[in-house]
Amino acid sequence: MKLPYQSSNRSRSLFASLTIVTAILILASRSLVADKPNILYIYTDDQSDRTVSSYERSQPWVDTPNIDRLASSGVRFKHAYNGTWCMPARATFLTGKLQYGVQSMRMEGDYPGSEYDPKKAPFWMSSFKKAGYTTAHIGKWHTGTDTGYGRDWDHQIVWNRPKFPENSGNYYDNQLISFNGSEAKMTKGYSTDNYTKWATNYIEGQGRDGKKPWLLWLCFAGTHGPFTPADRHEGTIDPKVNIPLPTDIFGHRPGKPQYVKK
């Protein structure tokens, strides 16, 4: 993807302060019966549908051929809405309930601390396990220190932000990663590359029962502001691309501090 430079001021960014689901991509394996396809669910932070070229509203400078290929054989969400904050949005996805209907989910402790009671807020992945699926989660986690490994996920490689507040700002590298419930270890490398590698390994058969259909929730963090691309993209980003700023629906915010008005 070729991206122009973005303003560090998130209120002036096209991405605003949203956590959205870009696509659900359902990939059916020829070896499985039609009613139990493999499921790859890609979930990203702070990303507009205008930055995925398979969507009609995408900006002319966007080019995402790999995602487009997946979307062509899967499903795109074109008329859907999710909450605008990390934890509530994930709570909705994991439970299938509106944010205010998710019992026990709460912010607790230092940001981004959060907790929940799995008995009061069960995740629907457990139903897939009962239906014969093997389940996996790879990437960012921001829904309580309990990541659900062993209960909801058979396989998990996780960056647990609530558990490690001191590491919660490391969206792009040097993340504390736990592999299948093990002690978290500092992990080098660009997070998007790491998550993609681990997801590819899982899809190709590592860490799962090859006789079962699989469900993988893949949560990328690298699209989160302040938008720091991998070093290899140096020189591919055109600083002259003109990006029109969206209309501010809140106006000039009279009476608010200067930093809010910006």
Ranges and model annotations:
Residues 16-28:
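Bacterial N-terminal signal peptides
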Residues 1-13:
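N-terminal secretory signal peptides that target proteins for export/translocation
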Residues 13-15, 39:
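N-terminal export leaders
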Residues 5, 28-30:
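Short, low-complexity segments with poor structural confidence in diverse proteins
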Residues 30-262:
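Formylglycine-dependent sulfatase
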